[in-house]
Amino acid sequence: MALVRGAEPAAGPSRWLPTHVQVTVLRARGLRGKSSGAGSTSDAYTVIQVGREKYSTSVVEKTHGCPEWREECSFELPPGALDGLLRAQEADAGPAPWAASSAAACELVLTTMHRSLIGVDKFLGQATVALDEVFGAGRAQHTQWYKLHSKPGKKEKERGEIEVTIQFTRNNLSASMFDLSMKDKPRSPFSKIRDKMKGKKKYDLESASAILPSSAIEDPDLGSLGKMGKAKGFFLRNKLRKSSLTQSNTSLGSDSTLSSASGSLAYQGPGAELLTRSPSRSSWLSTEGGRDSAQSPKLFTHKRTYSDEANQMRVAPPRALLDLQGHLDAASRSSLCVNGSHIYNEEPQGPVRHRSSISGSLPSSGSLQAVSSRFSEEGPRSTDDTWPRGSRSNSSSEAVLGQEELSAQAKVLAPGASHPGEEEGARLPEGKPVQVATPIVASSEAVAEKEGARKEERKPRMGLFHHHHQGLSRSELGRRSSLGEKGGPILGASPHHSSSGEEKAKSSWFGLREAKDPTQKPSPHPVKPLSAAPVEGSPDRKQSRSSLSIALSSGLEKLKTVTSGSIQPVTQAPQAGQMVDTKRLKDSAVLDQSAKYYHLTHDELISLLLQRERELSQRDEHVQELESYIDRLLVRIMETSPTLLQIPPGPPK
């Protein structure tokens, strides 16, 4: 055998060899009828065989000799099945000896049968097609009528014809991928009846060849059983059944395959369309569902804590940017907030409940984002609510002196107004830094009266400005918090200033507070005094420590006003208590903690402020995460157990 194989001629490099053959059984004509009666009919099906592979078509019931199937299947050719024929044709020497062994594998056998309910299926005819001859005629698709013959050794009769299409392919999908069943031994009549009584679906025993479009499969056994059930009414079954296993191998992912598979294996009833829809086609359910849910945001609308409102949710810009710019970013506000998966819809604006005691001094309207604008509009009214009354009574006797001092400082700092970085250079020609001293504005009795109120308002007020710092600049927040909390004797920053200088500083400060220009430009580098918060200790020590910080804040505010070019007229204040301020300023020997910041430059103060702001921002983020968690937990409780949130009725009075 090795010598014979060695004598094989080499195949031409340009010769095309198929690996599969695709057979399509279209129809038949002139078949013999097997049923009794005048109009003889038959339940015909065809068995297709190449080598040892067998496949069967569906059963066409009660056909009058002209059934139509239009079903196809594919067979894999054995290796070297057509090589001998090709080499013999190329050599013009006839069939080669090595081609005889593969001759049986190159024959297509078509056997037409009649499906009988009881007994063996009846033979209708058989046709044998030589595939090598068909392939020798060319690679094109061949459609031809083949005559049906009798079995070998039997008398030849007129059995009709069958039309078949043969197509050779290469590297095509095999029909075995469809789990097509082979035509094994014929079953006994009793096994068929037993299967039908049990209602068994015989997918493994009927044809699984592919169906061309616009065709339906009919169960061969169920077809004859339906005819018999008309008389007896016992074996009545559905006659037609579509199966995805009988689809063509050329339509693996087609719509007909998917719909047929879902229709035959899934529930057939109301709502079956939703059950059998493929995931790719049912994706519109989720998208449209999300669209519907987005259009109805009133499912869960609730307000969060006092730090923000449902209709004023915002995303705050970086706080370093607030320090450098000093104004609000209008694009950072938003009227809609998505907290996790919850949509906060816009609701009617109402009073907000705050956890601080300062809500009595501020207007109780929608949000605290417009605090600066309200302070600008109300002017003297907000000043009356914020500052001590003793300071208002003493702010009218030093207007002329304050105006002169502001004019002198404006002349000195005029070059610094054009360039913010030259403020330090503008102070050097004077030989000493600009220090502002503010006189005492209340007696010791007023300090004793407001000591208790200051302790109560200290924590809530700082908490309020901690959460709602966006509407005010940093210098204004520090100044208001420190002055609003202390409200007592204020000591100057330097013991070397005279009483006239103190009166000038005080009159210019309160004159600016009462006249409040809304168009005033902020300083390019607002600096917040770090010692504005109250310090633990005795009352005298607290007052002495906070005096320098207040003086520093007022001096920076005055410099900001001078550089911005908006000097407001001031009112004259009386000089009552001026000598007491001078004595306290000279007698104070306690070192203020804010003195350690005097040697720092403007840039160093800004960097220190930015560091503190980063720490506060981290704390705010943590608080916001906790608030979001509480909101999600509340919504989850509302969804799962809303009865937990119901207030039980109180006892009858």
Swiss-Prot record:
GO terms for cellular component: centriolar satellite; ciliary basal body; cilium; early endosome; early endosome membrane; Golgi apparatus; Golgi membrane; intracellular membrane-bounded organelle. The gene is RAB11FIP5. Interacts with RAB11FIP4. Interacts with NAPG. Interacts with RO60. Interacts with RAB11A that has been activated by GTP binding. Antibodies against RIP11 are found in sera from patients with autoimmune diseases such as systemic lupus erythematosus (SLE) or Sjoegren syndrome (SS). It is also found in the sera from mothers of children with neonatal lupus erythematosus (NLE). Residues 375-387, 420-430, 447-460 have a biased composition (Basic and acidic residues). Residues 5-146 form the C2 domain. It is found in: Cytoplasm; Recycling endosome membrane; Early endosome membrane; Golgi apparatus membrane. This is Rab11 family-interacting protein 5. The keyword Membrane applies. Binds to vesicles enriched in neutral phospholipids via its C2 domain. The interaction is favored by Mg(2+) rather than Ca(2+). Keywords: Cytoplasm, Cytoplasmic vesicle, Endosome, Golgi apparatus, Host-virus interaction, Membrane, Mitochondrion, Phosphoprotein, Protein transport, Transport.
